[in-house]
Amino acid sequence: MKALHLQHRSPTSYRVKARASYVDETLFGSPARTRPAQPDFDPPWVQNCNRSRGVGPGPPKGSLAKRDCESPSSRGSTPNLTPRKKNKYRLIGHAPSYCDESLFGTSKEGSRMAVGDAAKLRTLFWTPPATPRGSHTPCPRETPLRAIHPAGPSRTEPRVTAGSQMSSQDGLCVPCSLGQRRSHSLTHLTVPSTGHPASSAPQTNGPWSPRPNTSGATVQSPLVTSKACSGRVSGPAPPRRGACPPKPKPPWK
């Protein structure tokens, strides 16, 4: 009960009576007694030392301005002609911004955008590049591929066509596309590793060998089929690049 009594009494016992401020008098009216007049302060951008507006009869205005310009802390130690130290936080100049013009209107000199700042503001915005990225123009890394690809088939096409005609006469399979011809040529290189001797590799590869085969008889492997042997023994045949490689039989058959 005692604690509750103290809580009930605490707001009234510790209340501080505040005097009516200037804001209270402006909003809610002045109290019974009259309040002294507020001093008339100059705006911060006015830099004059003459503050003798409401001064009555006395010394001349020049002496008052001279006395006001002196700092109170330096009157005793320094001479009287020392000027007052400048306040570094005083607002020297202010150019109206976009927010100022939006809230308070344009100034008398003219709008901020009419002075010539519109051209400067355009450089702040992002501008798209001259060539759009979604166009059908080829990428720079695709151009060397276009220069390399046509040169490959033009050199090897006459030999491939001649070899395909001869292979069709012998009854061997003929590939249809250049990609298959290249894959078959790679299989020719891998055939000697399965069981052929190293000496027969340049003879069976056709155009891959440095010297063409002049003699009709060749060294035959036991794994080569009879159909492929009959084609070799018949005579010196032109190199066939597109012919299918013979499938070797395993030794246990």
Swiss-Prot record:
Query: Which Gene Ontology molecular-function terms are recorded?
Result: tubulin binding
Q: Tell whether Cell division is among the UniProt keywords.
A: no
The keyword rRNA-binding appears for this protein: no
Q: Where is the composition biased (Polar residues)?
A: 71-81, 188-228
The principal localisation class reads cytoplasm
GO CC terms of this entry = centrosome; cytoplasm; nucleoplasm; nucleus
Instruction: Report keywords, A-Z.
Output: Cytoplasm, Cytoskeleton, Neurogenesis, Notch signaling pathway, Nucleus
Q: Position of motif Nuclear localization signal? A: 81-97
Region of interest (Disordered), ranges: 30-89, 127-175, 188-253
One GO term (biological process): neurogenesis
Span list, region Interaction with RBPJ/RBPSUH: 112-140
Compartments it resides in: Cytoplasm; Nucleus; Cytoplasm, Cytoskeleton, Microtubule organizing center, Centrosome
The segment annotated Interaction with tubulin runs over 140-253
Q: How does it assemble?
A: Interacts with RBPJ/RBPSUH.
Recorded family membership:
Belongs to the RITA family.
- Main role? Tubulin-binding protein that acts as a negative regulator of Notch signaling pathway. Shuttles between the cytoplasm and the nucleus and mediates the nuclear export of RBPJ/RBPSUH, thereby preventing the interaction between RBPJ/RBPSUH and NICD product of Notch proteins (Notch intracellular domain), leading to down-regulate Notch-mediated transcription. May play a role in neurogenesis.
- What is the name of the protein in this document? RBPJ-interacting and tubulin-associated protein 1
Provide the organism lineage as a comma list.
Eukaryota, Metazoa, Chordata, Craniata, Vertebrata
